[in-house]
């Protein structure tokens, strides 16, 4: 049976300010598949420690799922950490930036500059469209392994998963 690991990203998870229900729900969703969830972990919103955990998890497991840290705030560093762990640069995707701008326009608002970072991805990532928010996810396949990045809010990641 192949291994899976799930990382809940967010300092608020470590301090109990937010209850990490995502990890358990994602783990339960993997039960019907030939994947054994071997490890779950909560990691702070810090690039270097998160990159290290991603690199180690990706070395051990066939599937690594990260939940959280894809928002527009300075502490949302999952993209940067995964780019560092996989040794790939972050690049702006103009089409996705346009979708995020359209999300705000549809609500009668201009997109804040901070949301621009949500349109950044590494070259090996495929976008997972977020029908309910501005944080798209990623699906990365490398060396026969998969890495999935999902936003933290359950109403956003569930339709993507």
Explain the meaning of each model-derived region.
Residues 9-11, 66-74, 151-152:
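Glycine-rich beta-strand-to-loop/alpha-helix junction loops that act as flexible
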Residues 49, 76-161:
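Proline/glycine-rich low-complexity loops and linkers
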Residues 44-55:
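Structural motif
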Residues 1-41, 45:
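Glycine-rich phosphate/diphosphate-binding loop of Rossmann-like nucleotide-binding domains
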Residues 39-41, 66, 149:
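Short catalytic-loop micro-motif centered on adjacent basic/acidic residues
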Residues 61:
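An anion/phosphate-binding loop that grips the pyrophosphate of nucleotide cofactors and donors
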């Amino acid at each position: 049976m192949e291994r899976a690991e799930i990382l809940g990203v967010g300092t608020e998870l470590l301090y109990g300010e937010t209850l990490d229900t995502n990890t358990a729900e994602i783990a339960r969703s993997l039960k019907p598949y030939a994947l054994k969830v071997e490890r779950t972990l909560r990691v702070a919103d810090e690039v270097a420690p998160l990159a290290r955990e991603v690199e180690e998890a990706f070395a051990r497991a066939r599937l690594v799922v990260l939940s959280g840290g894809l928002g527009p705030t300075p502490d949302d560093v999952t993209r940067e950490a995964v780019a560092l762990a996989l040794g790939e640069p972050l690049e702006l995707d103009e089409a996705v930036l346009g979708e995020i701008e359209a999300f705000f326009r549809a609500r009668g608002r201009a997109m804040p500059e901070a949301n621009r970072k949500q349109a950044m991805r590494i070259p090996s990532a495929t976008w997972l469209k977020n029908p309910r928010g501005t944080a798209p996810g990623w699906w990365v396949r490398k060396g026969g392994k998969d890495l999935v990045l999902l936003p933290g809010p359950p109403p956003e990641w569930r339709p993507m998963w």
